[in-house]
Regions:
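A carboxyl-terminal module marker
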Residues: 116-118, 129-130, 152-155
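Structural preference for alpha-helix termini/caps and helix-kink/transition segments
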Residues: 2, 132-135
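Flanking scaffold residues of small Cys/His-coordinated metal-binding clusters
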Residues: 129-132, 144-145
Length: 159
């Protein structure tokens, strides 16, 4: 935290019991090295997800330039995938994919279509999401109630 919250970090540091060799100021300390090695499969999975996200961002930017959407949360994203990419993305819940891509909804479709990007076997298309804007999360949802909240936000707020 020291590079970002330097004053708060220094205040916390002043309460840490001092050991021989410790510096007076937290910003002069070295960062500890991670003890656990990175899981190769985990890293590969997230590298792939981020590559897909890069392709999605390009499609969203084009939709924004075409005035189809104003912000990415106004988008319903359709991903056209070959079988392998479809099976990979289908392991991730759709609401989590929507959060990852910062859109209101994600639809997976097996087959060809959409704008091709760097990721092999993937095409993407963006359209304006159906429904109304939730006042809390700003996602577009057909089931936004009279209180202006989507079912998820209403549940979180206990309404």
């Amino acid at each position: 935290l020291a590079p970002i919250l330097c004053f708060t970090s220094q205040e916390i540091w002043s309460y840490v019991p001092k050991m021989p060799g410790m510096k007076d100021y937290v910003v002069f300390e070295q960062m500890p090295e991670a003890k656990a090695a990175a899981d190769e499969a985990f890293t590969a999975k997230w590298d792939r997800i981020m590559a897909i996200r890069d392709d999605v961002k390009k499609v969203l930017e084009q939709a924004r330039a075409d005035k189809t959407i104003g912000s990415s949360l106004e988008a319903c994203l359709t991903l056209y995938c070959n079988k392998e990419v479809y099976d990979f993305l289908n392991t991730i819940p759709m609401d989590e994919l929507a959060d990852l891509f910062i859109v209101s909804k994600v639809d997976l479709t097996e087959g060809e279509g959409g704008v091709k990007g760097i990721v092999e076997g993937l095409g993407a298309a963006a359209a304006h999401a159906a429904g109304n804007k939730c006042l809390r999360c700003w996602k577009y949802e057909p089931a936004v109630g009279e209180n202006g909240l989507c079912p998820r936000c209403a549940k979180v707020l206990g309404l």
